[in-house]
Regions:
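Short, well-structured alpha-helical segments that form the helix of a local strand-helix-strand
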Residues: 66-75, 130-143, 158-166
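Short, charged, surface-exposed loops that flank catalytic or proteolytic processing sites
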Residues: 57-66, 127-132, 153-156
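Hydrophobic alpha-helical scaffolding
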Residues: 1-2, 110, 128, 151, ...
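Glycine-rich phosphate/dinucleotide-binding loop and adjoining beta-alpha-beta core of small-molecule
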Residues: 1-102, 173-176
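Charged C-terminal helix
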Residues: 143-176
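Short beta-alpha connecting loops at secondary-structure transitions
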Residues: 54-55, 101-107, 117-121, 145-154
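Gly/Ser/Thr-rich beta-alpha loop segments that engage phosphate groups in nucleotides
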Residues: 3-5, 87, 105, 112-116, ...
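Short, small-residue alpha-helix embedded
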Residues: 53, 109-140
Length: 176
C-alpha cells in the first residue's frame, strides 16, 4: 500500500492539489485522518475502521450509527462518502443517503475495496457525476459480489468479481 511515510504524505499532498476528481481509499484515508482535507470533487470510501480514524471514533461507534457517521464524513471532508459494509451507504450533501441492498458477507476480504475503487473510477472516467458514479459503482460491485457468491460466500476473492462485473454492467445496459 501507500503507507504512512513522509513520501506518502508528500504524494497525497500533490495529488490533492489537482482539480481532477479523485477516489480515495485505504492508506490515503489513513493519511487524511492525520492531515484532514476538504474538497468537493472526490469520493472517499472508508470501511468502518477507516471511518472511525477519520472521525476520531472507535469503529464500534461508527457501526452504532452508520447514518450519522457517513453524514459526518461528508461534513468534515466534503464530496461524496461511501461507508462500506453491510448495507453500504453513499452520502453527498444535498442528496438523500443511498443504501446498497446487494452484496454479501463473503465480500469482506482483502482487495474488495480496490475493486470497488476501480469500478467507481471507471464510471468517473465515463463522465458520470461523482455522486452518481459512487451510487452506481457500489450497486454494481454488490451485484457482482452476489453473482460471484452464487456457489457459496466462503473463499470469495476480489478477483472473482471481475468477470461478474462484465455481466452485471452488460445487464444494466440491456435495461437502460
Amino acid at each position: 500500500g501507500l503507507g504512512r511515510s513522509s513520501w506518502s504524505r508528500q504524494l497525497l499532498a500533490q495529488v490533492l492539489e489537482t482539480s481532477l476528481p479523485l477516489v480515495v481509499d485505504a492508506d490515503a484515508l489513513n493519511l487524511l485522518a492525520l492531515e484532514p482535507a476538504h474538497r468537493e470533487n472526490w469520493i472517499i470510501t472508508p470501511h468502518p475502521g477507516e471511518a472511525g480514524r477519520l472521525l476520531g471514533l472507535p469503529a464500534a461507534g461508527v457501526q452504532q450509527d452508520r447514518l450519522a457517521a457517513v453524514r459526518g464524513l461528508v461534513e468534515r471532508f466534503g464530496g461524496t462518502a461511501v461507508l462500506k459494509g453491510a448495507g453500504s451507504l453513499v452520502c453527498t450533501a444535498g442528496r438523500p443517503i443511498a443504501v446498497c441492498t446487494v452484496g454479501n458477507p463473503g465480500m469482506a476480504t482483502a482487495g474488495m475495496g480496490d475493486v470497488l475503487t476501480g469500478v467507481i473510477a471507471a464510471l468517473i472516467a465515463q463522465r458520470l457525476p461523482l455522486a452518481d458514479a459512487a451510487v452506481l459503482g457500489v450497486c454494481l460491485h454488490g451485484q457482482a459480489g452476489d453473482r460471484a457468491a452464487a456457489g457459496g460466500e466462503r473463499g470469495l476473492l476480489a478477483r472473482d468479481l471481475i468477470d461478474e462485473l462484465r455481466h452485471v454492467v452488460n445487464a444494466q445496459g440491456e435495461t437502460a
